[in-house]
Amino acid sequence: MAIQDAIFRRSELLLGNEAMERIAQKRVIIFGVGGVGSWCAESLVRSGIRQLTIVDSDRVCITNINRQLMATTKTVGLVKVDALKERLLTINPSADITALQKIFTEETAGEFHLEDYDYIIDAIDSLKDKAALILLACQTKAKFFSSMGAALKLDPTRIQITEFWKVKGDPLARALRNKFKKEKQFPKHKFQCVYSDELLKNMGHNATCGTEQCMCPKAKNGPGDPSLLNHEWCSSKAQINGTLAHITAIFGFMLAGLVVQDATTSISTNAPLGNVLTATAERAG
């Protein structure tokens, strides 16, 4: 048995060869490979996705270690997408992984050629950039899935999937909807979101991110390193909220699950497959 076949033998056992071939042909792009996007990327590669583009402008910070897949004490200061790509290729060396150290904005949107992809995954934190991606992605023929806020959560049983306009109890979704209404710009079609209606409060001390006490890449690379230009993102956040790995990972896994189930729905004879969109929407509604 070839190594490539052996890697995905257990997946093929469940889904069948035709479904695995379908998965391998899909092209996916993920925007944001932090606490949610990094786990989504690994799950997709382990599930058989071979054509994956990962987009993030940031470098690994020591405060990422508690929740981001590629963040370790050895990767602090490295470009996130490069560190993640290296890990993904150890899982499937034949995968075609494109790592883009870029940020998605209204100004850079044309650089990503979204029309080339079958699936677009949104794991962006910035409200403005997230809104811009949603509007553009919904103009393409690609399937689009989005993550709402994963911070200030503890209970994994409250994580769910529903259509964007049906999301309840999530401040990020509320802010996005208000922005769309205020600017009178709306997504051209409905799309599924992963979210939680839980909202806790920060119980610890104020974060030092972006201050002189910050332990981000400058602590390892030195204050003269040009990569610190990207560190502005940390200090520009209005508020730093607490996050936990088990929550962000579940968000990422559920996004990956939406891709895999959508890609295999028309092929697999296993009843549970393909039912997630309808079932979760009904529960949330």
State where each predicted segment sits.
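Glycine-rich phosphate-binding loop and adjoining beta1-alpha1-beta2 segment
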Residues: 49, 54-92
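Acidic/polar active-site rim loop that often engages polyanionic ligands
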Residues: 63-70, 153-163
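Conserved N-terminal Rossmann-fold NAD(P)-binding element of oxidoreductases
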Residues: 30-32, 55
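Conserved SAM/SAH-binding loop
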Residues: 101-109
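Glycine-rich phosphate/adenylate-binding loop
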Residues: 2, 115-119, 124-129, 143-144, ...
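Hydrophobic/small residue at the entry helix of a nucleotide-binding pocket
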Residues: 36
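N-terminal charged helix/coil linker that caps or initiates catalytic domains
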Residues: 1-29
